[in-house]
Structure formats: structure tokens, C-alpha cells
Amino acid sequence: MKLTKKRIVLACVAAAAAGVAVSAIASSPATELTPVPSANTKSAGYAPASVLSRELEQIAVAQGSTRLENPSAAVAYYGYDNDVLGPGGQPVMVPTPATPVEAQKTEPDKNTYLVFKNGLSGGTPGANYGTRFLFQGHEAGSPGYITRINLDADGAHRVTLLATSDKNGNPLPVFDGSTWEPWAQRLLFTAERGNAGGVWAATLDVPSVVEDVSGALGRGGYEGIQDDSDGNIWIVEDVGGSNKPGTTARRPNSFVFRYVPAKPGDLHNGKLQALQVLRAGTPITFESQAPLASPDQVALHTYGTSFPTRWVTVHDTATDGNAPFDANALAKAKQATPFKRPENGVFRPNSKFEEFVFTETGDTNATSPENDCCGGWTAVLRLEQSSPSADTGTLSLVYKGNQAHAGFDNLSFLSKDLLAVVEDAGDTLHTQRNALDSGFVLDVTADYSNPANEPLRWLAEGRDPSATIDAGNGGFGKNDQDNEITGIHVSDGDPTTNGILGTKTPHPWEPSGQWRVFYTQQHGDNPTYEVVRPEK
């Protein structure tokens, strides 16, 4: 029997419940995955290994203790600052009785994979760095910095430090998101720092020339960042709102933005717009979502409903100039619609950039009274437009989470319909539900209002010993604790405009090997993994 997408989801759920392997359920290796039946549990001193679908394996391409080929005085390793040194002059990566402290972990974050047929230069003249590269910013420490994993290089040249300061000598902020802007020929990095955050553009050079472009793209708690085929840049914000009185439910406080450049590749002149959602002809706003379980929030998170949208311009360099500005405050003033920490978004492949899917991470607390009604557990939403530059569209709910599927953060398409999403549920929710983070596959064509349809777990993340030590010692006052999953990234590395994510249908784990899958197990040892399908 030929399996439809709905049947694929149902088959996976039924097999998971019965403990039966799911294999050969469709022609693409992305769908030939055995579900991992449950998440790893959490308890003091317990450091379980990660469990992947049996068809998959992961290979560390770098980890926090990988030494940079061109270290600086402040930064010498992929995942550690030089702020606390041991007797041997190296960062204290694991506490000892004699040195019961740790160096600052720098938390490598979102990954961007690129292939350059003629290679790139590095920190060592004459070294062979190959053609395949993985770029990332770092989310913690001081200064912030940018690195490049040279996937084809030897150990001594595996990771290159690109920059710790901008072109004016200012220390870089810590970074979350990243993408490649093919028209500008720049890497773009986002800083999730509220009205001190924004977007920085970096060249491929070593050292990289890095420029703060927040005079056009604004300042905000920016995380997710993607191009579209018209040269617009879509930015998804993560700014946690204040608690609603007397509860652990948090106010929606983060926006989805679209930067429309004067021409593709122009990072200095253009308009920043924010998404506005309307209900019964009235904008859903920061104020309208202030009451507990507000009607607007409930409506947005109800299966089968859809809402008209429009883009409102919050800043135009032609009339407002090029001084950095607070994008979040302007979006509120223009009555744009905030969400519960949307964090990241991607375009559905082969949709002509007419479908944009984004997550809401939610409240990450099992006691939130808005978990079931309002996206407090998590949600996946879909924006549909007639073109990527259209002024209007429609927003609808793809998936509403529950305790076992919560805190969705990063996402990346595995095929036209199958979406990989990963949890960042956080230490509090890990403890409350006795479950660490997982990675799932959602089918964006499935009807998740039917409780028989559930996401397929492809990864039950573990907790490495370093993270377990941090969890038992409060991170030594500086470091994060439980591991989280970040930087899930599926790409063929095409640096041209034809390679913008969403242009082509991904084909990971196929014999051609062009499409590759990466993620980082953030915190603890901070390994960055490539997920592969071993040869049978």
C-alpha cells in the first residue's frame, strides 16, 4: 500500500506505541526513521547518552575543547574563554578539588553550512582547508566571537577564529542566529540582547570584517534570520515577556520582522516591517494579549482557525535615517502582533517562499495556566502569502504542544513536508516533567488536531558529564546546566541565490551526500554534530 503523509504519521505513532521499528515507510531516507520511544530522564548525577533513530548516527565535527588554529589572548578554544586558567595555563574545563571553578563556556549556537569550490583561506598560510565549512556565532562569554569549522581540514586546522571585534574595534556581542546573505556576500549574525541586540554582517576573510547593520535592521532580541528569493531578510525575535500577575504565564513579547532592502544585498537602506495579525478586523496586540488566557491568544492557538495578516512598517531609512533603533518598541507602537518567544522560522521548500513556518517556544514551565490554551507548552505557526514580498497573508496553527512536546526552538526542513524541530525546554521544565530535550519530525500536512497524530522523536538528547556537573553545582555561577539542542541545520551548502534555504527540496542522507544535517548539543562539552546515515 502506498502511504500518504497522514498514514506515515499514523504508522509512526502506532509503531512507537507497539515498540515496532518503522522502516521503508516512504521513498526518502528522511522518512525512514524508527521513532525513539521516550526522552531521557533527569536525576542528580545521571549523565545518559543520547539516543537517535536507529537509522542515524552522529559524528562530532568539533567540541568545546577543540583548540582554535589561531587563538587570541581571550579565546583559544571552540567552547571556552580564557578567563579562568589552570596551573598549565589552559582554561579550567572541568572543576577539580584544587580548582573548584570553571572557565566561561561560550556556547556555540546556530550553524550555517557553505561550500566554496575554490576553498577559503584561514589562520595558517598555505594550509589546505578544503571546500566545506560550518559557521557559527557564540552565545555566551566575553568577547563574543565567530568561528568556522573546516570540515575537510586536519585536527590542527579544524576550527578557525574569524573575529572577536567589529571593524571599528568594538568587542562583538554574543550571537545566536546566523545565515548567509548571497547578494551582499556576507554572513549575518543576530544578537539576542533586547534593545542592545541586532544584526552584524561579516565577510568570509580571516580576520573577518564585521559591521553592525542595526541602523537599517534595528535593535532587538533577534535570533532566527533567513533570506527569501526577493532579497528580503526575515528575522524572528526572542524576548521573554513579564509574568502575568500571580502566574508563571508570560506575556507575548516577541515579533516576526521582515527587512525589505532598497535593493537585494543592501544592508544599509531599506524598511523594517513587523507582522500584524488581525482577528475580526482588529489587530492582535501586546495590550490585547495582556489578560490571562486572552481571547486573542486562545483563538491564535485553536486548530482549524486562520487569521488575516499584514506587514506594518516600523522604520524606513529613507525617512527615519540610519541611527540604530529599538525595533521591539516600535513594533508595539505600530500595533504589530507579539508571540510567546517565536525564536526561529524557515521557509517551506518549493513553496516559492510563500509559506513561512515558525516556532513559539512558550513559557517553558509546567505550572503556566496558558500551557494548554495559548501556546505555553509550544506551538508551530504557518504564514502563507501570495509572494515573499506580499503585504498581506494568512496565519494558521500547525501544531500545539503538550508536556511531552514542549519548548520548540530551532527548526529545519528535511523534505518538502517533513520538518525537524528541536526542544529547548530548559532546566525547570526538564525537572518538572522528568525528561530532557528531544528532537522531533513534524509533517506540516498532517492534522494535529487529531490526537492520534503525534510528532516522531528522532533524538532523545542525553546529558554529558560536564553538563551534569554544572547541573549539580549551579553552573558555578556562570555556566548553563542541562544540555539543550540548538542549530539544527539541513543544507547543501550552495552559496548562490539558488541555495537560499527554501528554494530546493532537501534530500538528506541520500547517496549523493550533498545535503548535510548538523546540530549542536549546547552547554556541557558543547559538541557540534553531523547527523549521518551509516552505510548498510
Show which residues each predicted segment covers.
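Gram-negative bacterial Sec-dependent N-terminal signal peptides
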Residues: 4-25
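Conserved small-residue
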Residues: 25-536
